[in-house]
Amino acid sequence: MAAVLEVEIGGEAVREAAGEEVDLSELAPEERWRVEHARMHAKHRGHEAMHAEMVLILIATLVVAQLLLVQWKQRHQRSYNMVTLFQMWIVPVYFTVKLHWWRFLGIWFLFSIVTAFVTYKATRKPLVQTTPRLVYKWFLLLYKMSYATGIVGYIAVMFTLFGLNLLFRIKPEDAMDFGISLLFYGLYYGVLGRDFAEMCADYMASTIGFYSASGMPTKHLSDSVCAVCGQQIFVDVNEEGIIENTYRLSCNHVFHEFCIRGWCIVGKKQTCPYCKEKVDLKRMFSNPWERPHVMYGQLLDWLRYLVAWQPVIIGLVQGINYCLGLE
């Protein structure tokens, strides 16, 4: 029995018999998509029970994977963070090479070179005095760039949804591609930069000696020394600095502005680097224009699971479906 596939193209009905293939290369992109979409529906017609099984497998795998990841993070947080960071760094590269997204690959390569150099400097012993400020300035710059890129991408997406792109005679698909690309760049490099900054912060702070992940610090902190970078503080808390200001936490310990911003916002540390007292970020950054940076950092934490682990879980689900003969 010959199956007949009907696709509406340009107002005319195009019939594709079972032995008669339509040359997709001669069709416009939208028409080609319609033909492929109709073929997919014809292929999966009558597979409702099989599709229901696949949905149940997907839901069960997501629930089990989430429980396992939570337990792993609670019991062995260090290994969990390292594996997550590695996947965040490697997994998107596989898709970019497969889809020939050379622009993303070039930016990723440049980011990897600079970040590898900064990470190498941060993990050396003895630690050079200028290294902590170099590290925090780089990751703080990267964080602000990713934040700005994400905001521009979000605005571009919203403008497209409201049709404002037509005022500039920009096609909706071009405007949406531009916005989503910028949004992805901002979120991806924001997450990746924060994870590298957290790792470097632990190495540097423990090397300097004023901070220890577990136990007492190996050095005593004087009133005029920053516990993050170990260098002298010359600007008083009440004075306006030329390059940067000095911040005092609720525990009365003082730090350089770049250092404590890098430690708390970029490095994801919510405690004092010396005494481990809880830091109130809303109190420390009282300016309302600075608070979105804190909320943006929390958003990046939520999205880490989607970028690092979601492709792995989807791949596992596809493997299960393949073994069970589901399509």
Curated annotation (Swiss-Prot):
This protein's UniProt keywords: Endoplasmic reticulum, Membrane, Metal-binding, Transferase, Transmembrane, Transmembrane helix, Zinc, Zinc-finger
GO cellular component: endoplasmic reticulum membrane
Reaction catalysed by this enzyme: S-ubiquitinyl-[E2 ubiquitin-conjugating enzyme]-L-cysteine + [acceptor protein]-L-lysine = [E2 ubiquitin-conjugating enzyme]-L-cysteine + N(6)-ubiquitinyl-[acceptor protein]-L-lysine
Pathway assignment: Protein modification; protein ubiquitination
Chief localisation class: endoplasmic reticulum
Keyword Zinc-finger: yes
Listed EC numbers: 2.3.2.27
First-tier enzyme category under EC: transferase
Entry-linked InterPro entries: RNF121/RNF175, Znf_RING, Znf_RING/FYVE/PHD
Listed SMART domains: RING
Topological type in the membrane: Multi-pass membrane protein
CDD domains listed in its UniProt record: RING-H2_RNF121-like
Record GO biological process: protein ubiquitination
Presence of keyword rRNA-binding: no
Residues in coiled coil: none
Localization annotation: Endoplasmic reticulum membrane
Function noted in UniProt: E3 ubiquitin ligase which accepts ubiquitin and transfers it to substrates thereby promoting their degradation by the endoplasmic reticulum-associated degradation (ERAD) pathway which is a pathway involved in ubiquitin-dependent degradation of misfolded endoplasmic reticulum proteins. May regulate the unfolded protein response to reduce endoplasmic reticulum stress.
Family: Belongs to the RNF121 family.
Protein name listed in UniProt: E3 ubiquitin ligase Rnf121
Organism annotation: Xenopus tropicalis (Western clawed frog)
